[in-house]
């Protein structure tokens, strides 16, 4: 059994069929331990083809897990994300743990995302009926600077949070070397 699992894992992480399952984070490879959602999303890119439209319900780890960094970057840089809403499962799926996070993403499988229209940490699916009124606009520069290594998406729930984060990220990070600084 363990040999079969090892062979299967090598197929997904080392084979040519899946290219976005082993991102580099902080200088190290961070392999996807056969997370089926990540594997499925990568296959969706191929199935949808260039210019295809995709709407998916995905586990929250796709939007904030280090192993799914390359999948997020593919959606941002080689696709146009039209909307993203993440939820905390507060009674939405009664038979699933209420701490579970998931997201609904829609994107075009070509182009590039300039501004992400999203809202995070929601508890009621009714938000989907009025998303245009509640979604915040997050410029791509914020997504690039927020988490430079693993490229996780910040859990933003208001336009004010976008503005504050933009101001914070316009300054050098505490870990950056700045010439002439003390």
Locate predicted features:
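SAM-dependent methyltransferase catalytic-core segment centered on the flexible catalytic loop
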Residues: 1-85, 125-128, 132-139
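Polynucleotide-recognition surfaces of large bacterial nucleic-acid defense/processing enzymes
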Residues: 1-15, 23-27, 49, 92-182
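Conserved beta-strand -> loop -> alpha-helix junction used to position metal-binding or nucleic-acid-contacting
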Residues: 81-82, 90-92
